[in-house]
């Protein structure tokens, strides 16, 4: 590996570690500054959303990409329908209905899972076109161990790259929802809500935006690295 690439990995790991430490401090300290509280809120929200996206999205995408035709059609219809309805509009209907912050996180996780599923499905179909043995194996029985070790890693890189955008995605939803008077998508204490709040000063807003952009870059670098490692196995 090139020294510059290794340096980027170290910086990405340092940024992620700093986020976790500051987020823990914001969750533990009784009178933490609003920026630390936002880091803590976003850390918990991102953890929940990413967990749901991986647990639901990867198996769903694998089923659509290498399973029965109806699974692919259903996923395509669902993702097209979700894409036509902005998440902010969904919040406009769900918030007045009394949906809690936990319910909002579940909604974000499910929406992210559908997007990840589509990315995994597309990556598997693209790999099938490049691998001449895929179609032959698909006609018969493909052991689960072969699918997990040889097929699914082909989708690791695109899926991790897509998941790396989750911090910016959540931040923008929180900021737009707060500015529109609908409330933050994940938490009223999030960084997006902090930036869109009327009482937030310029230094805090700039620091919050920088933190989100830095975390997104960090996750993208780490996702690219580990995605390549999985694809080479």
Q: Where are the model-predicted features located?
A:
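Generic hydrophobic transmembrane alpha-helix motif, especially the helices
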Residues: 56, 66, 71-118, 122-126, ...
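Transmembrane alpha-helices
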Residues: 43-52, 56, 144-177
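Non-cytoplasmic
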Residues: 92, 100-101, 105, 109, ...
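Hydrophobic alpha-helical transmembrane segments of polytopic membrane proteins
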Residues: 51-53, 92, 96, 179-181, ...
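Periplasmic/extracellular loop-to-transmembrane helix junction in inner-membrane transport proteins
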Residues: 1-13, 25-51, 194-209
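Short cytoplasmic-facing helical segments at TM-TM junctions of multi-pass membrane proteins
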Residues: 119-155
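Transmembrane-helix boundary motif in ABC transporter permease subunits
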Residues: 2, 22, 26-30, 45-79, ...
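C-terminal transmembrane helix and the adjacent membrane-cytosol boundary/short C-terminal tail
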Residues: 68, 108-111, 157, 164-165, ...
């Amino acid at each position: 590996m090139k020294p510059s690439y290794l340096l980027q990995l170290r910086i990405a790991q340092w940024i992620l570690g700093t986020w976790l430490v500051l987020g823990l401090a914001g969750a533990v300290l009784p009178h933490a500054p609003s920026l630390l509280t936002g880091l803590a809120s976003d850390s918990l929200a991102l953890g929940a959303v990413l967990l749901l996206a991986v647990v639901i999205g990867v198996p769903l995408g694998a089923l659509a990409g290498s399973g029965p035709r109806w699974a692919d059609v259903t996923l395509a219809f669902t993702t097209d329908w979700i894409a036509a309805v902005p998440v902010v509009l969904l919040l406009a209907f769900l918030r007045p209905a009394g949906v809690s912050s936990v319910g909002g996180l579940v909604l974000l996780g499910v929406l992210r899972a559908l997007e990840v599923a589509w990315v995994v499905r597309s990556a598997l179909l693209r790999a099938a076109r490049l691998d001449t043995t895929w179609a032959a194996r698909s006609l018969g029985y493909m052991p689960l161990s072969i699918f997990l070790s040889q097929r699914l890693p082909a989708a690791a890189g695109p899926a991790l790259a897509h998941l790396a955008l989750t911090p910016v995605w959540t931040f923008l939803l929180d900021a737009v929802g707060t500015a529109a008077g609908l409330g933050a998508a994940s938490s009223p204490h999030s960084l997006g809500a902090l930036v869109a709040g009327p009482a937030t000063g310029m230094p805090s807003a700039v620091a919050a935006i920088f933190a989100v952009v830095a975390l997104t870059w960090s996750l993208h670098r780490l996702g690219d690295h580990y995605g390549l490692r999985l694809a080479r196995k």
